From Swiss-Prot:
GO cellular component, one term: cytosol
The keyword Cell cycle is annotated on this UniProt entry: no
Catalytic reaction annotation: CMP + ATP = CDP + ADP; dCMP + ATP = dCDP + ADP
EC number annotated for this UniProt entry: 2.7.4.25
GO molecular function terms attached to this record: ATP binding; CMP kinase activity; dCMP kinase activity
Broad class of where this protein is predominantly found: cytoplasm
Binding, ATP: 11-19
Name recorded for this polypeptide: Cytidylate kinase
Lineage: Bacteria, Bacillati, Bacillota, Bacilli, Bacillales
Length: 224
């Protein structure tokens, strides 16, 4: 077993994947790869350029002209499209509410698949998303499917928004997350689902430290 593992964290919106992935990567000395940020950057660019979010071929053409970079930082990672940093703007409610439309286009997923795999090929990575264990890294050394109740995920997202000064409505977030769950699980291309060999982890009642410790135990089992 190689020492530098590929660790895949999947799950629905607001399950805490990014928070846990950042913490794990920092403790392990691994690189954190937020694939959701990649799709958000594409969505942000499409919205700015007025490209129809369900026009897969047009989106794929747009991606060819993008220069996406993920740069490690103390907060996890910074996202750049060419020379423009889009780390903060891709977290807007407009992008959040539209990224599912972009992500379900097969041409988009194909265009971004090689980029994601290339980032992870050397191992020593923690990658989070919706279909990492099922499609992007089907041979990952450790796969964890994280989830939590819709209410808890909305509470977490609300607190995150407030801490960042982003306008937020808890009840509206519940509706938006439930709708996004439906879209993500029903899309034809790479739907949200647990990989057969993934470990299921309900984080509803767990603290960040509790989740990290649970996954660290799984890592030790893989390395044993």
């Amino acid at each position: 077993m190689k020492k530098s593992l590929q660790i895949a964290l999947d799950g629905p919106a607001g399950a805490g994947k990014s928070t846990i992935a950042k913490s794990l990567a920092k403790q392990l000395g691994y690189v954190y790869i937020d694939t959701g940020a990649i799709y958000r950057a594409v969505t942000y660019r499409a919205l700015n350029e007025g490209i129809a979010l369900e026009d897969g071929p047009a989106l794929a053409q747009m991606i060819e002209n993008m220069s996406l970079r993920l740069v490690p930082s103390e907060e996890g990672q910074r996202v750049f499209d060419g020379e423009e940093e889009v780390t903060s703007v891709i977290r807007s409610s407009e992008v959040t509410n539209n990224v599912s439309f972009v992500a379900r286009q097969p041409e988009v997923r194909d265009a971004l698949m090689d980029l994601q795999r290339d980032l992870a090929k050397k191992g020593g990575v923690v990658m989070d998303g919706r279909d990492i264990g099922t499609h992007v890294l089907p041979n990952a050394d450790l796969k964890v499917f994280m989830t939590a109740s819709v209410e808890e995920r909305a509470r977490r997202r609300h607190e995150e928004n407030v801490s960042k000064g982003i306008p937020s409505d808890y009840e509206q977030l519940i509706e938006e997350i439930a709708l996004r769950d439906k879209r993500d699980s029903e899309r034809e291309v790479a739907p949200l689902r647990q990989a057969e060999d993934a470990h299921f982890l309900d984080t509803t009642t767990l603290s960040i430290d509790g989740v990290v410790q649970a996954i660290e135990r799984l890592i030790e089992e893989v390395k044993a």
